[in-house]
């Protein structure tokens, strides 16, 4: 009886892991699709007068979708 309870708990834990992993994969796919749309519509908002090498290197409009600001020509 005790081994059946342990087996049932392990089976439930395994099923939960599978469900959580599947949800995370679906979320990653949705984030990639949304990120692609955001990258295409990324607009630079830093004026060229305030454009420095540090800002060009470190400023990002959408951090999660890897949409970098171009910061003009610097």
UniProtKB/Swiss-Prot annotation:
Site (Key residue for binding both Kv1.2/KCNA2 and Kv1.3/KCNA3 (occludes the channel pore like a cork in a bottle)) residue list: 61
List cystine links. 42-74, 51-67, 56-71
Q: Which GO terms describe its cellular component?
A: extracellular region; nematocyst
Statement: the UniProt record of this protein carries the keyword Membrane: no
Among InterPro entries, the record links this protein to:
ShKT_dom
Extent of the signal sequence: 1-22
Which residues does the record annotate as propeptide? 23-39
What's in the keyword line of the UniProt record?
Answer: Cleavage on pair of basic residues, Disulfide bond, Ion channel impairing toxin, Nematocyst, Neurotoxin, Potassium channel impairing toxin, Secreted, Signal, Toxin, Voltage-gated potassium channel impairing toxin
Q: Which GO terms describe its molecular function?
A: potassium channel regulator activity; toxin activity
Task: Provide the protein's localization.
Answer: Secreted; Nematocyst
Site annotated as Important residue for binding Kv1.3/KCNA3: where?
46, 48, 50, 59-60, 62, 66
Q: Where is the ShKT domain?
A: 42-74
Q: Does Secreted appear among the keywords?
A: yes
Q: What does this protein do?
A: Inhibits voltage-gated potassium channels (Kv) with higher potency for Kv1.1/KCNA1 and Kv1.3/KCNA3.
Q: Which family does it belong to?
A: Belongs to the sea anemone type 1 potassium channel toxin family. Type 1a subfamily.
Q: What is this protein called?
A: Kappa-stichotoxin-Smt1a
């Amino acid at each position: 009886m005790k081994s059946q309870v342990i087996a049932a708990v392990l089976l439930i834990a395994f099923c939960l892991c599978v469900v959580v992993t599947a949800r995370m994969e679906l979320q990653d796919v949705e984030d990639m699709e949304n990120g692609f749309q955001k990258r295409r519509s990324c607009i630079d908002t830093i004026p060229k007068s305030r454009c420095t090498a540090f800002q060009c290197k470190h400023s990002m409009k959408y951090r999660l979708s890897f949409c970098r600001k171009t910061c003009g020509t610097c």
